Amino acid sequence: MKVSVLITLAVLGVMFVWASAAELEERGSDQRDSPAWLKSMERIFQSEERECRKMFGGCSVDSDCCAHLGCKPTLKYCAWDLTFP
């Protein structure tokens, strides 16, 4: 009886170590791939956005404001231009 319990515990321990190693290997490959993916996504988003130079006032044209903001000519501030991404 004691021998079968010890064998069962040993088998469970080996299975735990094997499953943990497989999970670490899988997670490691995700971490190796993710920096390249993040850099490519960063380039995509940077190419679509314009710089925010006059967000809180002092704008003269729409290009001074952030994306989806337009320059209001009366008070010279940036406000939503009613567009969606």
From Swiss-Prot:
Q: What is its main location?
A: secreted
Question: Which Pfam family, any one, appears in the UniProt record?
Answer: Toxin_12
UniProt entry tagged with the keyword Repressor: no
Domains (record comment): The presence of a 'disulfide through disulfide knot' structurally defines this protein as a knottin.
Which organism's genome codes for this protein?
Answer: Chilobrachys guangxiensis
Family membership: Belongs to the neurotoxin 10 (Hwtx-1) family. 28 (Jztx-11) subfamily.
Per its record, how is this protein called by name? Kappa-theraphotoxin-Cg1d
Q: What does this protein do?
A: Probable ion channel inhibitor.
Q: Where in the cell is it found?
A: Secreted
Q: Tell me which UniProt keywords the record has, alphabetically.
A: Disulfide bond, Ion channel impairing toxin, Knottin, Secreted, Signal, Toxin
From the UniProt annotation, give the residues forming the signal peptide: 1-21
Where is it expressed, tissue-wise?
A: Expressed by the venom gland.
Keyword Secreted in annotation: yes
